[in-house]
Amino acid sequence: MSEMTPREIVSELNKHIIGQDNAKRSVAIALRNRWRRMQLDEELRHEVTPKNILMIGPTGVGKTEIARRLAKLANAPFIKVEATKFTEVGYVGKEVDSIIRDLTDAAVKMVRVQAIEKNRYRAEELAEERILDVLVPPAKNNWGQTEQQQEPSAARQTFRKKLREGQLDDKEIEINLAAAPMGVEIMAPPGMEEMTSQLQSLFQNLGGQKQKPRKLKIKDAMKLLVEEEAAKLVNPEELKQDAIDAVEQHGIVFIDEIDKICKRGETSGPDVSREGVQRDLLPLVEGCTVSTKHGMVKTDHILFIASGAFQVAKPSDLIPELQGRLPIRVELQALTTSDFERILTEPNASVTVQYKALMATEGVNIEFTDSGIKRIAEAAWQVNETTENIGARRLHTVLERLMEEISYNASDLHGQNITIDAEYVSKHLDALVADEDLSRFIL
C-alpha cells in the first residue's frame, strides 16, 4: 500500500483537482492512517477501526474526481460504486454484498499483476530459452531423446546474443503456446458465486492444459511467452490469500450518490432501493464476513468513503445508524469564477491543454490568452447561475461550443495560429449566454 505522507497525497491531488482543501486533507489523513495502523502491534491493530468519511457538496465540484485520483495513489484494493444500483436483499437487483465480491476480484487482479511483475526477470529467461530451443534445437541421442549439455553450444550463444540485441525481432517462428481455456458462462442467483466459480473451473479443466502451435514474429512470441511463464511461476492459492489479506487490511470502498438512497417524506410500501439498501449497508460498514468465490472476507477494517450532492435530501435523512458509521463529514464548496480559471490552466492535463494537443495533430496551433481564459470562466459561471449549477462540468460544454468551428474546419487550417482571447470568446458565446432559453438547451 502507499506510504505517502498526508502532505504528499494532497500535493498529488493538487495536480488534478482545484480547491476543496478540506476534502483532500480528510482523505489524505484517512489513507495515511491505513499505513500507521499496520505499524502497530497485532493486538492493538485489531482494535483500530477506520474513520469513514461522508463528502457533501454540489455536483461537479470534485467529489468523484478525488475518488478517481485516490484510487491511483492508494496502491490498495479500491472500488467505486453507485448507491442507486443496489436493492434490498430478496428483491430483483444487485445486493450490497456484491461490493465486497467486486473489491476482492479487483484485489486478486492487482495482486496477480504484482506477482507477475515480481517474477518477470525469471520469466524472461525461461521465454528466451523456449525461443532458442526453436531456433537451435538441442542435440538428441540415438533414441531421439534430448541430451543434457553441460555448456550451451556456440551456435546457441550466438543466437542468444542476436536475440537480446533485437536482430531477430522480425523473424517468424512456430511455437507452442497454451490455448485459451474453454469459456463457460453460468448465470446464478446472488450468493451462489462460489458454486458457479467451481463449475466454471471444472469445465475449463476438463480438457487439461492444451498447447496450440502458432506462427509469430519473435518479438510478439516473446511477449506471449513471458506472460505464460510468469503465470506458471505464480501460486494461485497464495495469490488468493494475499488478495483477501489486502482487502481486509487496506481495502477502500467509495460509494457515490448516497443522497439518492435517502428516504424523502412519508412513503407507503417497502422502500427496497432506498432505506432497505441503507439497512443492508450497515453490517458492511460496521464489520461483517462476506462469502466470495476466493474465500471469506471480513469488512471490519475496510475504509468506506461516501459522497452525495444532498441538494434535495439532507445528511440527516440517512438512517441514524448509518450516520453514526460515517463520523467524518467534509463539505465541498461550490466553485467560483476564479476556481474555473484555475481549472482551465493549473491541472497537468487541463481541458485547454487537451484541446491544444488535439488541434496540434491537424497542424493548427491554438493559443489561449489570459483574457480569453477569464471570459470562458465567466461565461461558464454565468450559465451555471442562470440555469442548473453543474459545477466544473459546465466548462466542457462551453469549451466544446467555443471550439466547434475550429474543430470542424481544422483540416483546412493546417499551419495556422489561432488566438482565443476575450474578443473571440465574446463573439462566439455572448449571444448564447445572454439568452437564458438558449443557454438552457445549448450550454
Curated annotation (Swiss-Prot):
Pfam family, one: AAA
Sequence positions that bind ATP: 18, 60-65, 256, 321, 393
Keyword Cytoplasm: yes
One example GO MF annotation: ATP hydrolysis activity
InterPro entries in the record: AAA+_ATPase, ATP-dep_Clp_protease_ClpX, ATPase_AAA_core, Clp_ATPase_C, HslU, P-loop_NTPase
Cited function: ATPase subunit of a proteasome-like degradation complex; this subunit has chaperone activity. The binding of ATP and its subsequent hydrolysis by HslU are essential for unfolding of protein substrates subsequently hydrolyzed by HslV. HslU recognizes the N-terminal part of its protein substrates and unfolds these before they are guided to HslV for hydrolysis.
Oligomeric form and interacting partners: A double ring-shaped homohexamer of HslV is capped on each side by a ring-shaped HslU homohexamer. The assembly of the HslU/HslV complex is dependent on binding of ATP.
The name this protein goes by in its record: ATP-dependent protease ATPase subunit HslU
Natural source organism: Salmonella arizonae (strain ATCC BAA-731 / CDC346-86 / RSK2980)
Source lineage: Bacteria, Pseudomonadati, Pseudomonadota, Gammaproteobacteria, Enterobacterales
